[in-house]
Swiss-Prot record:
Residues 116-206 form the RRM domain. It comes from the Eukaryota. GO terms for cellular component: nucleolus; small-subunit processome. It comes from Eremothecium gossypii (strain ATCC 10895 / CBS 109.51 / FGSC 9923 / NRRL Y-1056) (Yeast). Signal peptide: none annotated. This is Pre-rRNA-processing protein ESF2. Residues 1-17, 37-55 have a biased composition (Acidic residues). One of its GO terms (biological process) is endonucleolytic cleavage to generate mature 5'-end of SSU-rRNA from (SSU-rRNA, 5.8S rRNA, LSU-rRNA). Residues 18-28, 83-95, 267-280 have a biased composition (Basic and acidic residues). Involved in the small subunit (SSU) processome assembly and function, and in the 18S rRNA synthesis. Required for the early cleavages at sites A0, A1 and A2. The keyword Ribonucleoprotein does not apply. Belongs to the ESF2/ABP1 family.
């Protein structure tokens, strides 16, 4: 009996040593996972993955010592130490960090709906977008700025009349990151001079600024695209009408040329026929008559030779 007890004790001691080695290996694996897992995939180690690394020898050791092996359902789970709770804490931290990133992403998406857009109905002459951005940036962070140039026809007329050749802008839109900055800009600049240093070229120019409530930059892009489409359709319509007028004019010109050629040919044929008729030799014979009742112009005068002969005879 003592021999059997000694065998059991020796067996349990060997298995306990082997179990300690496995625990150390498991602890090293956990430490390595904690130190080197920066990504989300490396931090997903949990108790189920660690439990798969346990060998059947541990279960036999627990059976020899009278301990029940832990089942997959977790009905009989031995109390874990503080070192074994670190992966769970790490997982909780990663989950919190992930939630924080998601909240930040949602906040950045919602920030697009909190931007403010102002409308500039009048731009100071020859002011460039860089200068306008510098002026508007005094009221807050400016995101996007769009200034609409004058049309080419007015630019040519101005240059032709002796004006400046620089580019002028008629109107513009500016988008602020924060809505309150856009409202502050509209309330401050509307109807007031730009100010600044007295030697500034735009010191005395008056600004017309209006805050567009409920208006977003996407609405502006859609409006500009719609205006471009309408302008393009009008241009195509005008071009088609001009082409029709040109085709009709060319057809009328060709028709008039054809009619003129027909008339000219007809007159030419008539003239040629008249000329041929006038050049024919016509010999008109003189009408004579011996009748007593005939007029004197038609009577044939007596021959002089015959009268001479008769005169000599008598």
């Amino acid at each position: 009996m003592s021999d059997n007890d000694s065998d059991v004790q020796d067996f349990s001691s060997e298995e306990e040593d082997h179990g300690l080695l496995i625990d150390r290996k498991k602890q090293q694996t956990l430490d390595f996972a904690q130190d080197g897992s920066d990504s989300e995939g490396g931090s997903d180690l949990d108790d189920d993955d660690i439990a798969e690394e346990e060998s059947p020898i541990q279960n036999e050791t627990k059976a020899a010592t009278g301990e029940e092996p832990a089942t997959a359902d977790g009905d009989n789970i031995a109390p874990q130490s503080a070192d074994e709770l670190r992966p769970e804490e790490r997982a909780d931290q990663l989950k919190q960090e992930r939630l924080r990133r998601l909240k930040k992403l949602k906040a950045s998406k919602k920030s697009n709906h909190k931007t403010g857009v102002v409308y500039l109905s009048k731009i100071p002459p020859y002011m460039k977008p860089a200068k306008m951005r510098q002026i508007l940036s005094r009221f807050g962070d400016l995101d996007r700025l769009f200034l609409k140039r004058e049309d080419e026809h007015s630019h040519r007329q101005r240059v032709k009349g002796g004006g400046n050749k620089k580019v002028m802008f008629r109107e513009g839109w500016a988008e602020f990151i924060r809505k309150k900055d856009a409202k502050l800009c509209a309330e401050t600049l509307n109807g007031n001079i730009i100010g600044g240093k007295k030697g500034n070229f735009y010191h005395d120019d008056v600004m017309n600024v209006k805050y567009l409530s409920g208006f977003k930059w996407a609405d502006l892009t859609e409006q500009i695209a719609r205006e471009n489409d309408v302008r393009q359709s009008k241009l195509q319509l005008e071009i088609s009408q001009a082409n029709k007028l040109n085709a009709e004019f060319i057809r009328n010109v060709e028709k008039s040329k054809m009619l003129n050629n027909i008339r000219a040919k007809k007159h030419k044929d008539e003239d040629s026929s008249e000329r041929t008729e006038s050049h024919l030799p016509v010999k008109q014979r003189k009408v004579t008559s011996n009748r007593a009742s005939a007029p004197e112009s038609q009577k044939q005068p007596a021959s002089e030779k015959l009268s001479n002969v008769l005169h000599n005879l008598f």
